[in-house]
Amino acid sequence: MGSLTRAEEEETAAAEEWSGEAVVYVNGVRRVLPDGLAHLTLLQYLRDIGLPGTKLGCGEGGCGACTVMVSCYDQTTKKTQHFAINACLAPLYSVEGMHIITVEGIGNRQRGLHPIQERLAMAHGSQCGFCTPGFVMSMYALLRSSEQPPTEEQIEDSLAGNLCRCTGYRPIIDAFRVFSKRDDLLYNNSSLKNADGRPICPSTGKPCSCGDQKDINGSESSLLTPTKSYSPCSYNEIDGNAYSEKELIFPPELQLRKVTSLKLNGFNGIRWYRPLKLKQVLHLKACYPNAKLIIGNSEVGVETKFKNAQYKVLISVTHVPELHTLKVKEDGIHIGSSVRLAQLQNFLRKVILERDSHEISSCEAILRQLKWFAGTQIRNVASVGGNICTASPISDLNPLWMATGATFEIIDVNNNIRTIPAKDFFLGYRKVDLKPDEILLSVILPWTRPFEFVKEFKQAHRREDDIALVNAGMRVYIRKVEGDWIISDVSIIYGGVAAVSHRASKTETFLTGKKWDYGLLDKTFDLLKEDVVLAENAPGGMVEFRSSLTLSFFFKFFLHVTHEMNIKGFWKDGLHATNLSAIQSFTRPVGVGTQCYELVRQGTAVGQPVVHTSAMLQVTGEAEYTDDTPTPPNTLHAALVLSTKAHARILSIDASLAKSSPGFAGLFLSKDVPGANHTGPVIHDEEVFASDVVTCVGQIVGLVVADTRDNAKAAANKVNIEYSELPAILSIEEAVKAGSFHPNSKRCLVKGNVEQCFLSGACDRIIEGKVQVGGQEHFYMEPQSTLVWPVDSGNEIHMISSTQAPQKHQKYVANVLGLPQSRVVCKTKRIGGGFGGKETRSAIFAAAASVAAYCLRQPVKLVLDRDIDMMTTGQRHSFLGKYKVGFTDDGKILALDLDVYNNGGHSHDLSLPVLERAMFHSDNVYDIPNVRVNGQVCFTNFPSNTAFRGFGGPQAMLIAENWIQHMATELKRSPEEIKELNFQSEGSVLHYGQLLQNCTIHSVWDELKVSCNFMEARKAVIDFNNNNRWRKRGIAMVPTKFGISFTTKFMNQAGALVQVYTDGTVLVTHGGVEMGQGLHTKVAQVAASSFNIPLSSIFISETSTDKVPNATPTAASASSDLYGAAVLDACQQIMARMEPVASRGNHKSFAELVLACYLERIDLSAHGFYITPDVGFDWVSGKGTPFYYFTYGAAFAEVEIDTLTGDFHTRTVDIVMDLGCSINPAIDIGQIEGGFIQGLGWAALEELKWGDDNHKWIRPGHLFTCGPGSYKIPSVNDIPLNFKVSLLKGVLNPKVIHSSKAVGEPPFFLGSAVLFAIKDAISAARAEEGHFDWFPLDSPATPERIRMACVDSITKKFASVYYRPKLSV
């Protein structure tokens, strides 16, 4: 690393005047950024100054929770620009001279909600609320940057960089849709006067009367003439009157202020430069050859955070005009290296409209590719040059620069400019032909010629905001020679198949000079197979799939060019109509959502679709989560020291470097635990700190505390552990083979006699098969977090935690510290999603933090980074099912013999209860006379897998639906026929002895068949498939039956505390946790209905172990049943006490009645309690009633797949569910939609990749998919185009409070309808090749599995017809 000598420093100071003054406006308030903060991100700064509405969800720009709007003034165009960015990646000093607007700045409950905030809240667009501020700000930035109301497509596109795990996106899209349907003026002016003409204060951005203003240089400056008047949006569906604030204008100071060159510093010797001229950049590069040039920091930010890269000198080139050129010239478009990708998009759109059509083929290809490049926030800051010089092998643009014949202009520190073809620029893995004293100056993109065609290709796990698995840029120039069209020039460049963007040189040579016709294809395919060779263990895996994509892309390119020639009249042999589907990219129309339910109650809070009680807090960023809690004085921050081996003996732990690290306050290991080091929710088989042997990667070995979070993480990384490795079990198959099972985890359920049935001859057919079900990451938006502090010098321990089970935190901490539970208090206000991932796994982090807090007598906060969270906390259990099914030729099921195994990981946790529920649900909704289900929990060297929405039920039902499909294939009948023929009915006896009561599956199924018009849908799909060779559609109907109750009897209990105050308001406390599912809202509705008072009179503050003791975790979908009933019990007690007073007087209000009762000394507080009756199961006898009742549902799905790439779209989803008489139909429908989309992710998108025998390119036991960059949950672009949800009408559930039913988990499995619709489409593709037999499709049905199952001449070059892509299970 170079460094400036004193002489060079003096020379630099003399040459240019560098300033150390950095000014930024935040929500209209002027702030001076002190020197020394170059290491901070904008997000850290915003939260440090008391603006916690902007959230840290991932830290890599992948989730959008940190979205803010940045406004800057362009001195060239004299216009203010507004755009959304990821604050988690933006260096603090990168926004110097800009105006930052956060969610707090646009509206709150005191000033009034902004129309965007209000609309989102009222449309039920917020559940857990952690992602909500990010969505608000993405929409706000779109409106502020729009000259006219945006289209619905633009709205959806603007949300591509925002993730939500709760809602399923439909209500968010519906909330924002209104902003595209009105022509009101949309906040796009930068006037210095407000609507009533009053001046705007430069320091606050709000109306004032401070008179004339002065600019930053002290000279008199009159206010600019306003070009437009402006006022907040006012739409029919929004109460605009509630919003009294005007939009924050761009601060005049920043508009008038002279921009200066900046030189600032940061922690650990970091230097930050912001030059204003190219010569300054070159001078700095001469002094610091290894300095990093940055624009958006989207790559460097990830490297420093997750790869521990250290760059001492950072040069921000955002203000260098020479690097920002965008010019149209005779030889093409000249693009400065610092041009942002969003700028390039807008420029290309304009160029395409203005230039001749034959010139713009390259422009169109790049523009189309940019649509799928990252999310909006990244494109707003990432630069052309940054993407080029990073030289990523999966860059979406580099193959196109190479294919289009682009050239790069490079300048050195002596102002010498050289030009190099893009195809020669990339030398190796992240290596380019750029010397340390050179920088990329610009890109020259040439115009295309007549009959020159350029096309882009990309296939990723997920379309939006995802890196490519394989991408390509292809170009061909053909000329007519003696009546034939001859290839004059061709470029074929692939990404994702080598260490650099890879040129298919043999293929290019062969094609040059050849006649353009179908005869090219076979030889071209053979040469491409030689040109692109992936080793068996190539990084990224999926070798067969990625190889097939190289041929598929060229085939698509050939057909594209041929079709273009044909429609222009230059090609006589046109494409057959069925082949056109290969070149037709799916154009996604705007989605539509429909919700159908009836309101059966009037005049009471129960049954009304009221908005989530925290919605207004969430949309304004005022809702407080654990990491938002103001920290007590002297709070220390913690970071974990984790195992890096799957199974190893610890030989030594060296903390010497950590102890000398800045801010270090302590390292805590197993020897420091005051109480018991072993813990667990059922069996205490897990150590808080590993003492001798580690049994998985990510196991906690120690905990470091320091004065800041960054210092704690830095110190933790310096702890060196020496290991002696031991053999590891890394899959279910390995565990079964080795007999590696958790103790006492074998279970068996028997009904009838399976063996006798198989041997009796009653079964006309017997099938056998194996189903692999992949795991799933919870991906709750709020990471695991806890704040622990001692009270009375450790006599008590209090904590605030993000958990579904405060009582478990209380127990764990008391056990670890050796304290009685009565001295440990855990409080939870709300959590940003849980889904089971915070039921047990969160407690061990609180326990670890409590050791440090107890020993040091100081508060300790622990917040996990997303990658640490994912690699340590466990996921949904992967399953292996082996089935044998006997049935008649008529399709009647006679016998099921099933062995199921789940991957428990390295400790017991909840794996046995998960297995048990899976076994209970192994029949789904089918009546089977003879059943034998054996199950066992596998011990593997992975983090302990844990509870996840459905708790094993979905995995077992997926196995059941697979053997149903297998039966249908054998019988050559539709799966829907077989399902309907075998439905359970009222009075059916299940395979664990429970009598089925109130069975509504027939009603649900029948209503769905009518709603989706199934027979017509089938005819339409057949017709489409007959006319399209390379795109296929498929449909499926899937039923579900989900048992409600904890299968462990004692957990079916609940407590609540209800306190009525003399003003008639009510404080309710219960043992359940609000995590977005609307539990507090429903409970409040129950209380309001009980007292017959407005819902606004009920308040629920938090969940606390010192208010309601021994609370059952918020899980099993039973919380509304349990805590609603407990609250009802408490309310009824109070009402019974009040009744004598009420009967004696005519009280005008509830408040008057309460006051009268108080004056008569009547107790206005009550503890309510409820137990679920008539449940329990005996595993010795194998009989019992594990469930109080069942929730039924069914879903129809229609999909369309691209058989050449594996890409798919969900066209239609129709859901019918029996929820009895809903307490809140809006919240319940939100749960159905969110659950379905989460289930869709599990079934078709989300794949965990572990270092196992199937993925040898990953280090053994390590999780590769440990962040949003590599693990893809559904995005806005993945939701169904037509999404309909209906609640079954006219049904009651007399067993439960207000005849309602549980909803959290039951809809999840319905997402598998998409998987089976995909399989239906694949079957149509296989039939084209003459393959009609059964084939397995493991979950998730990713593009890899879809493509490789659609066997054709291309896939057969790389794999057999029965190839089964590898899966971590």
UniProtKB/Swiss-Prot annotation:
Q: Which keywords does this chain's UniProt record carry?
A: 2Fe-2S, FAD, Flavoprotein, Iron, Iron-sulfur, Metal-binding, Molybdenum, NAD, Oxidoreductase
Residues engaged in binding Mo-molybdopterin:
Q804, F835, R949, A1116
Check the record and name the InterPro entries matching this protein: 2Fe-2S-bd, 2Fe-2S-bd_dom_sf, 2Fe-2S_ferredoxin-like_sf, 2Fe-2S_ferredoxin-type, 2Fe2S_fd_BS, Ald_Oxase/Xan_DH_a/b, Ald_Oxase/Xan_DH_a/b_sf, Ald_Oxase/xanthine_DH-like
Q: Which SUPFAM superfamilies match?
A: 2Fe-2S ferredoxin-like (SSF54292), CO dehydrogenase flavoprotein C-terminal domain-like (SSF55447), CO dehydrogenase ISP C-domain like (SSF47741), CO dehydrogenase molybdoprotein N-domain-like (SSF54665), FAD-binding/transporter-associated domain-like (SSF56176), Molybdenum cofactor-binding domain (SSF56003)
Where's the active site on this chain? E1305
Q: Which residues form the 2Fe-2S ferredoxin-type domain?
A: 20-106
Which coenzyme or cofactor does it need?
[2Fe-2S] cluster; FAD; Mo-molybdopterin
One Pfam family linked to the record: MoCoBD_2
Q: Which residues bind substrate?
A: E839, R917, F951, T1047
Q: What is its EC number?
A: 1.17.1.4
Does the keyword field hold Hydrolase? no
Give binding positions for FAD. 293-300, 373, 383-387, 396, 440, 458
Q: How is the cofactor bound?
A: Binds 2 [2Fe-2S] clusters. Binds 1 Mo-molybdopterin (Mo-MPT) cofactor per subunit.
Q: Which residues bind [2Fe-2S] cluster 2?
A: C128, C131, C164, C166
Enzymatic reactions = xanthine + NAD(+) + H2O = urate + NADH + H(+); hypoxanthine + NAD(+) + H2O = xanthine + NADH + H(+)
Superkingdom is: Eukaryota
Q: Where in the numbering of this chain does the FAD-binding PCMH-type domain appear?
A: 265-450
| Annotated positions binding [2Fe-2S] cluster 1 | C58, C63, C66, C88
What GO molecular function terms would the record report? 2 iron, 2 sulfur cluster binding; FAD binding; iron ion binding; oxidoreductase activity; xanthine dehydrogenase activity
Question: Member of which family?
Answer: Belongs to the xanthine dehydrogenase family.
Q: What does this protein do?
A: Key enzyme involved in purine catabolism. Catalyzes the oxidation of hypoxanthine to xanthine and the oxidation of xanthine to urate.
Quote the subunit structure annotation: Homodimer.
Q: What is this protein called?
A: Xanthine dehydrogenase
| Organism of provenance | Oryza sativa subsp. japonica
Q: What is the lineage of its organism?
A: Eukaryota, Viridiplantae, Streptophyta, Embryophyta, Tracheophyta
